[in-house]
């Protein structure tokens, strides 16, 4: 049985590494590359918009624009890119936070027979795209923490709702605090785990399966669903 995947991304962001021999690649090109790899039985819903202004739209209007794509999906993949977040705009005035919020919420609608059907919180995954220089360090950076190698997530680059679902495992987590009050997490620590594009595209099913496994343990995470 195929999976229904919703992809959330900043469609026009061109601050990414060019794919193969292409020039002026955008995040949309990475989405197309992913789509070309997936099983034909899987359905992909793209959260693509043409820059429509959200500032004058109420919550219900935004939901009407997104519901058909998100409601039927069970997995949401966020493509993180250097220009994903427009810092001069509020989160509520950008599409991605709404897409993440509705992916996490349990929402109800009527089926063709008039029966109320409720969707469940989607499995979630973030894929970090390389910047123009092929580096991931704008978000994922290798460092030394507490005398051992670690990887720092620059969560200040994220929307609030995504940031709140990072390092939010409250049950069965493996973390410690060392000098300078650095908190070191080991293993699975976030509902929205992040993976580099180069790893994801070579074995995307593995990372989607891991996201589905986290979904089956929702009670272990403090899920933030509001923008």
Name each model feature, range by range.
Residues 1-75, 196-199, 203-227:
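Conserved N-terminal substructure of TIR/SEFIR domains
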Residues 4-6, 11-17, 130-227:
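C-terminal interaction surface of TIR/SEFIR-family domains
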Residues 14-25, 86-96, 137-144:
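Short, flexible/disordered intra-domain loops and linkers
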Residues 58-67, 100-115:
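Short secondary-structure capping micro-motifs at structural edges
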Residues 76-82:
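Short, compact, well-ordered microdomains
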Residues 82-83, 107-110, 115-135:
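Short beta-alpha junction loops
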Residues 83-109:
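Conserved TIR/SEFIR loop-to-helix hotspot centered on a Trp-containing motif
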């Amino acid at each position: 049985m195929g999976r229904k995947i919703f992809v959330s991304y900043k469609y026009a962001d061109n601050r990414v590494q060019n794919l193969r021999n292409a020039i002026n690649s955008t995040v949309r090109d990475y989405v197309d590359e992913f789509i070309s790899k997936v099983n034909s039985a899987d359905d992909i819903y793209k959260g693509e918009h043409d820059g429509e202004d959200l500032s004058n739209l109420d919550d219900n209007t935004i939901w009407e624009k997104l519901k058909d794509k998100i409601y039927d999906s069970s997995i949401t993949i966020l493509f993180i890119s250097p220009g994903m977040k427009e810092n001069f705009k509020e989160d509520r005035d950008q599409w991605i936070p709404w897409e993440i919020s509705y992916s996490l919420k349990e929402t109800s609608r009527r089926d063709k027979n008039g029966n109320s059907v409720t969707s469940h919180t989607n499995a979630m995954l973030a894929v970090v795209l390389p910047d123009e220089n092929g580096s991931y360090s704008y978000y994922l950076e290798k460092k030394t923490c507490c005398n051992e190698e670690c990887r720092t997530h620059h969560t200040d680059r994220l929307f609030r709702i995504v940031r709140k679902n990072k390092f939010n495992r409250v049950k069965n987590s493996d973390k410690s605090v060392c000098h300078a009050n650095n908190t070191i997490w080991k293993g699975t620590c976030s509902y929205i785990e992040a993976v580099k594009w180069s790893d994801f595209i070579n074995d995307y099913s593995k990372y989607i399966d891991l996201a589905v496994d986290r979904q089956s343990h929702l009670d272990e995470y403090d899920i933030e669903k509001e923008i």
